[in-house]
Amino acid sequence: NTYFHHTPNEIYLDGNSLGKLPLQAKADIRQAIDSQWGQNLIRSWNDHWLDLPKRLENKLAQLLGADPDELKVGESTSVNLYKLIHALLSSKITPNNLVTDSLNFPTDVYVMEGLAKQLKCNPLIIVNYSSDLKADLTLLKKEIEKQPGIICLSLVAYKSAWLYPMKSLNEFAEENNSIIVWDLSHAAGVVDIDLHLSKTKIALGCTYKFLNGGPGAPAFIYIQKDLITKLHSPIQGWFGHQSPFDFSLPYIPAEGISRFDAGTPQVLSLIAMEAGIDLSLKAGITNIRKKSKDQTAYMIDLIDSKLTPLGFEIETPLSQEERGSHVTLKHQECWRVCKALIQGKDSGVKVIPDFRPPNYLRLGIAPIYTSFVDILRAIERVKEIMVTQEYFNIDNERPTVT
């Protein structure tokens, strides 16, 4: 909390949805607004802004086990997924089958469904599992063998935090003339990812969760070096041109991954996200991952002793190697418990988790600012709400964001 904005008497367990505000980001944004934009105006493109994405890509590469020229920062995860899937379909590198599974984040499914219709491909195949806890890898592999092509999976499942075996699935996909597009959104900044060692060919993710980049922070894409020139972005924007400031016609894509740029970079958002990445590098991703394993194990032990007798079920893998950095609880009253935690009681502590349908309470652990004491107090607060039946006083009305 030395490095982040902290609200007194509040325990924040939602870093898996939106990370905290780094104090340095506040200073960086203020300086950018007052000086770079306010005083320097257009001159700041040359003085500060044009090289900003590359600087961030150099830093992200250290966290993701990639080369900087294999990464591109910008746009949103949804837009980037559209560009990547479209480029793969157009390349004919693999058969034009689109496959995902029922654990994937819905926006990925929506994008793939839309592309299948737009490009008149075979309908999207969704591998459905019997539970939300983990993937049935046998079922998934059978579908890949049957319908090889472009597979999109989330490295960490957004509901249960199940962590997919990245390298072995990449190897299996390659053996079956397929490419897996990995969504790293719930993993980046908290899982020790090595895109090279895991033989990953395509990946993307957001930076506003465990990387603490801020709401709407630009996302990133990764394309294995050998694939870059074989793929073409469907959005031919001027920043993807080999010489954007020549303003020449016709469009000639940049040689490297910059061909996946489109419009003008989101400068203020890029400035805001740098402090969070710097803090992750300062802490060290190996240290962050170790603490995440220890803290999720501690939380699960507390849940077993304090909440399981009250009817809660753990919907997160018990093995440290098979989970990301949030723990999911299942109970028919999870929504009202969630509201009670957020509202607090009298002058007591407020706990900020989140809720996912139909009845899941997600407790996100961001090791870079979550303490073991935070975890203990949060679980004791859930127990208090249940034992006193405090949730009976909470209505079931839900806001748009839960």
Where are these regions (language model features)?
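Pyridoxal 5′-phosphate
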Residues: 1-402
